[in-house]
Design a protein with these regions (language model features):
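Nucleotide/phosphate-binding catalytic cleft detector across ATP-hydrolyzing
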Residues: 1-154, 162-267
């Protein structure tokens, strides 16, 4: 057994784990399935994600992260423990040093919760770093120079916007509109226009498969199956990329407005 340095992107939608020298070794949804009666964890990650919207009454699928921060501390700890044990079995290390990405502008209490959850997995030492800075370095930006670099990191729960220079963040903003909000926008759009009820997994599939935020930039279609709210029966519609763009427009404009505000504050 030997120590390793690992990086964790503890996202609202997904958890990614990077091991120094090996690259990304885990990328799974931030979901835990529990027994609703006993609260006992039944599945974590990809296996639990398959249960979203499909679980019987006794099984509850939980997303312990909300808007980039811990919403359910105990479940987050269970999830982190599971993922670290999973990669530990493959990589043969003990008590790693862990770097965790966190959204900019979260409170000290929220930072402490993330750090404590990681420490309870047996980490030797835990470091926190703001997501925009990590994203910039990962994208190959040289943030040590006196010139400005802007990063827009659209995650599952938050969009982090930052201007970086001389190795640090000059100004930043974090808004709680991101990938999950896009999924909800799609669900609402289909419900309002077609009187069809679809789940969040279906909405995410639509977003990934035919989604766009630029009008006319993508011309694809997808058959979408859901429950007709009038008849109560299963029904299938055909959705286009233009419709997805329309569904996402308001949320995208909110992000653009935040980006313009962040840029103006340092000009």
């Amino acid at each position: 057994m030997f120590n390793k340095d690992i990086g964790i992107d503890l996202g609202t939608a997904n958890v990614l784990i990077y091991i120094k020298g090996q690259g990304i070794v885990l990328n799974e949804p931030s979901v835990v399935a529990i027994d609703a009666d006993t609260k006992r964890p039944l599945a974590v990650g990809s296996e639990a994600h398959e249960m979203l919207g499909r679980t019987p009454g006794k099984v509850k699928a939980i997303k312990p992260m909300k808007d980039g921060v811990i919403a359910d501390y105990d479940t987050t700890e269970v999830m982190l423990n599971y993922f670290i044990k999973k990669i530990n079995g493959k990589s043969f290390f003990s008590r790693p040093r862990i770097l965790i990405c966190c959204p900019s502008n979260i409170t000290q209490v929220e930072k402490n919760a993330i750090k404590e959850a990681a420490e309870r997995t047996g980490a030797k030492k835990v470091f926190l770093e703001e997501e925009p800075k990590v994203a910039a370095i990962g994208a190959g930006m040289d943030i040590s120079k006196p010139s400005g670099n802007m990063v827009i990191d659209i995650g599952g729960g938050t969009t982090d916007i930052a201007i970086l220079s001389l190795g640090g963040i000059v100004n930043s903003a974090s808004i709680r509109i991101a990938g999950n909000a896009f999924d909800n926008d799609i669900v609402k759009y289909i419900k309002n226009k077609y009187k069809l009820l679809v789940g969040e997994r279906t909405a995410e599939d639509i977003k990934i498969s035919i989604g766009t935020v630029f009008p006319g930039s993508r011309n694809e279609k997808m058959e979408v199956r859901g429950r007709d709210l009038v008849t109560g029966l299963p029904h299938t519609i055909t959705l286009t990329s233009d419709e997805v763009e329309e569904a996402l427009r308001e949320s995208v404009y909110t992000i653009i407005h935040a980006v313009k505000g962040d840029r103006k504050s340092v000009v």
